[in-house]
């Protein structure tokens, strides 16, 4: 039997060896709520005081419908409002894409549809949120997250296809209340004597719907999202910012950004434009939101809010019929092709109906026109003898900004996307080839495909010099796929596997000449995200810029720059 002293010495040596072996791994992880490194209640209280009492102890919105904090009047409000996207954007404990609120373990959810006695799990909703109302409060929150090694989440509206606006055991900076809008008749770039004409500066929390209303009152519009509840300064613009049809006319949102005001990982406020910190400015115009810092204000070009005539050509048919694709769908794409050549842009949509049929439409916008009959005449002339198989309607818009709904519903959807080149789309056989390949994708009930019109100014904006994949400069259309996610247990995982393994290969097959996607509408499990979103050269440059500005990866976004160094939820390096 060993002497007691020797036994204790050996045990202490063993424990020390284990600690030294595990310490590097532990130091490469973010702090979790059950660990000693987690901030004390006193630390959170001090933070709350520094944030002017804007720190929120966060719970899922459905928690008021469950024991032990059941509050029936509050529950009734949540049930009534939960399908309103505009309402959800103002709730730090909710997301527009609501299935990302749930965790990936068994029953890690807090559902409005389950009984009040059922457990309400925190899921992927952060534990605390800094509901910031000033740049200084953003700086305070960033410094706190850095000092305490917390998993930091940036949340604007919750329009996010990859789950980056939420995360378990995380600390959220909620930018929704940074809602200032300032119009400039002739904006001067900060740090230079260069004036660039009309522009608008917007706070991080401004919604496109509100910006369109404000712009409509002053006679301007920006190249922005089709949904009123998308944030104008957040991940949409920082991810590239693809409008439905205005990109063809004025370029992407990122092309039109003049400067960013951003709080970096050190907590400093930086103004980035073409003359100041041009590396960061380049990265922010397509490198992805929540990656290089917290954008608190963005300034972008504005354009006249034109009147327009909107024309819709639609068809419904049997997806099993070859002629539906070779004539009906190809015809709709041919209309878009023909009008694009004339400078008129639009969008194509295809959807599965509950009756088992397929519906499809092409919407085109004739800018600076007011006569409906003139637009309808152009459409019928373009369709020729085939016009009889379609329903054609046109209506005049007083302004482009008026063509956006005030609200958008909650969604449970996954996205995928691919680019179609000019070479394919503009070729004589392009529309038929695309229609034929589209017929192989296989939509389920309620799923749909839509295009965003590129070409035009998107191709001509090479001077804008953004980090998006070089193929954007020679592409005609972005084709996006929207996949419904059931609320049943395990449905999200099944939908993700179907998207990655079955649907995305078929989507990429639309144009075999390239394999390029758009991160804002991309597969959240895209295995080749570096190559398809940015391309190897741009990605390497983005990684270097991130190392320069955020060497400790305080800002990590799923399938974002540097995310390959971290696990699924961004907690531990891999």
UniProtKB/Swiss-Prot annotation:
**Organism in which the protein naturally occurs:** Penicillium thymicola
Q: Pathway involvement? A: Secondary metabolite biosynthesis; Alkaloid biosynthesis; Mycotoxin biosynthesis
Reactions catalysed, semicolon-separated, are: peniprequinolone + A = yaequinolone E + AH2
Name of the protein: FAD-linked oxidoreductase penH
* EC number annotated for this UniProt entry: 1.1.99.-
Q: Which GO terms describe its molecular function?
A: FAD binding; oxidoreductase activity
Database matches in Pfam families:
BBE, FAD_binding_4
Which positions are glycosylated?
48, 107, 193, 368, 385
Q: Which family does it belong to?
A: Belongs to the oxygen-dependent FAD-linked oxidoreductase family.
- Disulfide bridge map: none
Keywords of this protein's UniProt record, alphabetized? Answer: FAD, Flavoprotein, Glycoprotein, Oxidoreductase, Signal
